[in-house]
Amino acid sequence: INVALLFDWIKSRPRMEVRWTLHDCWAFTGHCAHFSFVKCEQWKTGCERCTQTKEYPKSWVIDNCKENFRKKRSAFCNVGNMHLITPSEWLAGLVKDSFLKNYPVQVAHNTIDTNIFKPTDSDFRKEHGLEGKTVLLGVASAWSARKGLPDFIRLAQQLDDSYKVVLVGVTKRQIKQIPDDILCIERTDSACELAEIYTSADIFVNL
């Protein structure tokens, strides 16, 4: 999608109502989708010399964040009848500190299917030798330092044998690199299987 052309088209129709759901911070930065991990606050005034060009969305050649910031601010501001929607109060607060602050912001939390994600009987503990253990669970679609993978590794090293750290969503390559004291499970596309894993956990950890 050519974002600039899209917003030019929207602005040419001032009576159009626009509802834009933001799932990350990309809309108001010069490059990155997340900046908290690197403690960057350039997005409040203007991005330049980005330290995350190799992170999603990756840019391998040039750092164009300063120009991207200017283009986004020009494109996204001054839309006549636009409301923003975020899935969390946290993201809504960031929006209100950005160049999008003049738009109304509504929080609509992500929902879950309680017909699937509910206490579910399974043999997960037995199959993985977790009976009698206190299970600490971490789940991610893609594990990285920003998602807290190094912190889970340190946590597992500090716990005694009565605990077991279980990580869901790791890749085959990561499994080879992660210490054996962590139970690693590759990403599953089965919501029912994920519900069984959640039910088997004693503690869910989100870093």
Per-region residue spans from a language model:
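Nucleotide-activated donor-binding/catalytic signature segment of Leloir-type glycosyltransferases, i.e.
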Residues: 169-203
